[in-house]
From Swiss-Prot:
It comes from Rattus norvegicus. Residues 401-417 have a biased composition (Low complexity). Coiled coil: none annotated. The gene is Apba1. It is found in: Cytoplasm; Cytoplasm, Perinuclear region; Nucleus. Residues 628-643 are annotated as: Autoinhibitory helix linker. This is Amyloid-beta A4 precursor protein-binding family A member 1.
């Protein structure tokens, strides 16, 4: 690379005056500490020629012993720095702040191909583990700006000595480099594969004592390792803190950019970066152990230079293929190195596995690796495409705009009109991602009444029709069905009038004089389109959600679509301050009139399309349509005995009779009445108690529990309790009273059939008393009545049972549920909890 053939001064001189670290990829990644320390100083003049150390063959004066030892350590550290810079460039994700320099980097590599073996770096003692060590230093190069001053591996005053010893380097690179059109792959996915590095010895470099250099390097590395361990723990804690509630708000998710910037690299590191640091720490510990255990002879062999590899008179000879990975091929050294390498790799792999598991536990799904590609945007309604329970959800049709997929079975002119999400809307994206996972687990479709197959309605169906014309009407927001039908009839009347005027060559009203045209009426769960039968060009296109009403009148079909009228700003301000004005808002209705022999089928198909679209909506939101199937619930209701055979009981003549009560004038009847309870088939009053020795009791014709239908010809059915009491009190001056009653036991028997827990019972209980009831549910069908106290459930008395236990019994009861109830007021009277008030 051209700009790396010189010394460090060349790289500093090439920087922008502002100190921006973006002039050169290698300058940014290989010498961050040089750039940081050079920033305060003024830049050199533009015409300043950088020094070329190769132009001065005289070696530099020997430094003092202590400086010489530091210099040797810095040289070894330079080896690590250059390698980490190389990997920092190759591992940069697409779209990163350094990606702009990539083309220049490729061009420089191509130009320097001829000088590939002219320069090299000295072989490091840990060459056996070089591959893993270099990748681990990826993190170190980016973090050295944040290291304390005493932890910097080399300072600015040592740059000249280092550059005198190392004037350049050449790599043969195959690491994670891919073309634009190649599929994405994680940078470390093929770790351990073929990695070629060409090393040559620099002949005129000063002789270094490898043992002293290794000792210095190990001491500095231990200090850096301790710092990295602290940073690693802080980052793990940072992940844990960011994990709590991240998916709750889009604002928090927006804080975490997909690709980290270099100035915030330490705060947004991903799992691979942390694992790389653990690799380096483990590798360093393994190297220490290896250095202590290996004999001196083997260490000397490992540190020996490559024979014949770098003499000045043969700079163009590349290293042999067998020496690209190992410089010394001594059998003894190879076996020892392989043994230590295998032990180290086993330990590292176990540690990496533990670290990844720990990180995954504290990391939420919103924390992504910077190398992970952006997920594709998903539609608001995830339209199902041939999904079976065994098929994976990832086989969904991709969002391609409005064009159908090539393999779609949609008819000619059909569109898949899928509305894409707003870009950058993580909340809807997170919600739809979860709904997609649940789609395939649901059955294909719940049966929807209609003439079409639900699958066909998703793709779209076509009916042939004649387009008669269109007209406009003003309508309220939610008119009744009768009003809708009147509007449809008015639209048909207008169109027929316009046709008659056109035939008589008279001027028709503007917008209504349209000739009859043969069209194809396209119907799907997304939209309704009117296509020209000859050209298949769309004449009209309405989203299904805008269709307000469909009517078939003979062979005429009226399709009404809603459009909001434009309003002035003053109207909008009034409606904003008075929300009740929204109900009075006028809507412009576009009424299209068609003529077809299949008018009824067209209307039914559009209605069925709404039902299928609703099922799609449920599926997209993770709800099984079977749970809300109206047909299934209707079938369940049909299995219930209506009011537990109350109709049969009330219709039997022997249970309904007239009773005459004789009494003295001024004497009360001597009864206590209560309401039969809302939910009974005939709401009236029930005799709850009778006065001892009173006219009612002495007659022997009345019993507790009898329902009074009428008194002296006045019906009590449906009247309030207070009104019924007033009527009975008015009998005080009469000597003979006629009552029409229905014999009923004081205790009501309830039978509820509940096949599955997913069906709610449809009533609520408070302290054993039924306080509310869902109209039309299985409980009402079974005879449950509001105001009744539950006496028994499935043969078990619950009179003295706590409320919580009663609720638990009812919530978990399935199959046939038998209950016995009575009016709560009657229960209190019979148990002497209340004193009766006779009338």
């Amino acid at each position: 690379m051209n700009h790396l053939e010189g010394s460090a001064e060349v790289e500093v001189a090439d920087e922008a005056p502002g100190g921006e670290v973006n002039e050169s990829v290698e300058a940014d990644l290989e010498h961050p500490e040089v750039e940081e320390e050079q920033q305060p100083s003024p830049p050199p003049p533009a015409g300043h020629a950088p020094e070329d150390h190769r132009a001065h063959p005289a070696p530099p004066p020997p430094p003092p012993p202590q400086e010489e030892e530091e210099e040797r350590g810095e040289c070894l550290a330079r080896s690590a720095s250059t390698e980490s810079g190389f990997h920092n460039h190759t591992d940069t994700a697409e779209g990163d702040v350094l990606a702009a320099a990539r083309d220049g980097y490729e061009a420089e590599r191509a130009q320097d191909a001829d000088d590939e073996s002219a320069y090299a770096v000295q072989y490091r003692p840990e060459a056996e583990e070089y591959t893993e060590q270099a990748e681990a230093e990826h993190a170190e190069a980016a973090q050295r700006r944040a290291l304390p001053n005493h932890l910097h591996f080399h300072s600015l005053e040592h740059e000249e000595a280092m550059n005198a010893a190392y004037s350049g380097y050449v790599y043969t690179h195959r690491l994670f480099h891919r073309a634009e059109d190649e599929p994405y792959a994680e940078p470390y996915a093929d770790y351990g594969g073929l990695q070629e590095h060409v090393y040559e010895e620099i002949g005129d470099a000063p002789e270094l004592e490898a043992r002293d250099g290794l000792r210095l390097y190990e001491r500095e590395r231990d200090e850096a390792a301790a710092y990295r361990q602290e940073a690693l723990g802080a980052r793990l804690h940072h992940y844990d803190e960011r994990s709590d509630g991240e998916s709750d708000s889009p604002e928090k998710e927006a804080e975490f950019a997909p690709y980290p910037r270099m100035d915030s690299y330490e705060q947004e590191e991903d799992i691979d970066q942390i694992v790389a640091e653990v690799k380096q720490s483990m590798s360093s510990q393994s190297l220490d152990k290896a250095a202590e255990d290996m004999p001196e002879a083997e260490q000397d062999l490992e540190r020996a230079p490559t024979p014949g590899g770098g003499h000045p008179d043969s700079p163009g000879l590349p290293a042999p293929a067998g020496q690209q990975q190992r410089v010394v091929g001594t059998p003894g050294g190879s076996e020892v190195g392989q043994r230590y390498s295998k032990e180290k790799r086993d330990a590292i792999s176990l540690a990496i596995k533990d670290i990844k598991e720990a990180i995954e536990e504290v990391k939420t799904r919103t924390i992504r690796s910077p190398y992970t590609p952006d997920e594709p945007k998903e539609p608001i309604w995830v339209m199902r495409q041939d999904i079976s329970p065994t098929r994976d959800c990832d086989d969904q049709r991709p969002v391609d705009g409005d064009s159908p997929s090539p393999g779609s079975s949609s008819p000619l002119g059909a569109e898949s009109s899928i509305t894409p999400l707003h870009p950058g809307d993580p909340t809807e994206a997170s919600t739809n991602k979860e709904s997609r996972k649940s789609l395939a687990s649901f059955p294909t479709y719940v049966e929807v009444p209609g003439p079409c197959d639900p699958e066909d309605l998703i793709d779209g169906i076509i009916f042939a029709a004649n387009y008669l014309g269109s007209t406009q009407l003003l309508s309220d927001k939610t008119p009744s069905k009768n009003v809708r039908m009147m509007q449809a009839q008015e639209a048909v009347s207008r169109i027929k009038t316009a046709q008659k005027l056109a035939k008589s060559r008279k001027k028709a009203p503007e917008g209504e004089s349209q000739p009859m045209t043969e069209v194809d009426l396209f119907i799907s769960t997304q939209r309704i389109k009117v296509l020209n039968a000859d050209t298949q060009e769309p004449m009209m296109d309405h989203p299904l959600r805008t269709i307000s009403y469909i009517a078939d009148i003979g062979n005429i079909v009226v399709l009404m679509a809603r459009r909001r009228m434009p309003r002035s700003n003053s109207q909008e301000n009034v409606e904003a301050s008075h929300p009740s004005q929204d109900a009075k808002r006028q809507y412009k209705m576009i009424c299209h009139v068609f003529e077809s022999e299949d008018a009824q089928l067209i209307a039914q198909s559009i209605g069925q399309a709404f039902s299928v679209a609703y099922q799609e909506f449920l599926r997209a939101n993770g709800i099984n349509p079977e749970d809300l199937s109206q047909k299934e619930y209707s079938d369940l209701l049909n299995t219930q005995d209506m009011y537990n055979d109350d109709l049969i009981h009330f219709s039997k003549s022997e249970n309904c009779k007239d009773v005459f009560i004789e009494k003295q004038k001024g004497e009360i009847l001597g009864v206590v009445i209560v309401e039969s309870g809302w939910g009974s088939i005939l709401p009236t009053v029930i005799i709850a108690n009778m006065m001892h020795g009173g006219p009612a009791e002495k007659s022997g014709k009345l019993n507790i529990g009898d329902q009074i239908m009428s008194i002296n010809g006045t019906s009590l059915v449906g009247l309030p309790l207070s009104t019924c009491q007033s009527i009975i009190k008015g009998l005080k001056n009469q000597s003979r009273v006629k009552l029409n009653i229905v014999r009923c036991p004081p205790v009501t028997t309830v039978l509820i059939r509940r096949p599955d827990l997913r069906y709610q019972l449809g009533f609520s209980v408070q302290n054993g008393i039924i306080c509310s009831l869902m109209r039309g549910g299985i409980a009402e069908r079974g005879g449950v009545r509001v105001g009744h106290r539950i006496i028994e459930i499935n043969g078990q008395s619950v009179v003295a049972t706590p409320h919580e236990k009663i609720v638990h019994i009812l919530s978990n009861a399935v199959g046939e549920i038998h209950m016995k109830t009575m009016p709560a007021a009657m229960y209190r009277l019979l148990t002497a909890q209340e004193q009766p008030v006779y009338i």
